[in-house]
Amino acid sequence: MPTINQLVRKGRTPKVSKTKAPALKGSPMRRGVCTRVYTTTPKKPNSALRKVARVRLNGGVEVTAYIPGVGHNLQEHSIVLVRGGRVKDLPGVRYKIVRGALDTQGVKNRKQARSRYGAKMEKK
């Protein structure tokens, strides 16, 4: 417990919380350009080929972003919208690409959780 004199001299410093998505610079989403689109393998107990893209954001920061959903149309120089949100089994992937925004198409034949994948309502 500090004395009154110590508090007068130094004061209390507030705890600084570290942001989980620093490249977004406080924005909910940021636009960027794909520099490389490739697949990578997840951490130990899981096995798959996860689709990821290297994206240069508008601030000049380059990040690795996950491409969610089944199938995608992204290639180099595609303009994408990037949001925060990590992928637990891919180390270093702390961002996701928003489906159905800018150059990214929505997932085809998606019936549930459509808004997350930019899928339009299917006509009867």
From Swiss-Prot:
Highest taxon in the source lineage: Bacteria
Please tell me one Gene Ontology term that the record gives under cellular component.
Answer: small ribosomal subunit
SUPFAM superfamilies the UniProt entry points to: Nucleic acid-binding proteins (SSF50249)
Q: Which GO terms describe its molecular function?
A: rRNA binding; structural constituent of ribosome; tRNA binding
3-methylthioaspartic acid modification sites are: 89
Family affiliation: Belongs to the universal ribosomal protein uS12 family.
- PANTHER family in the cross-refs: 30S RIBOSOMAL PROTEIN S12 FAMILY MEMBER (PTHR11652)
Q: Report the protein name in the record.
A: Small ribosomal subunit protein uS12
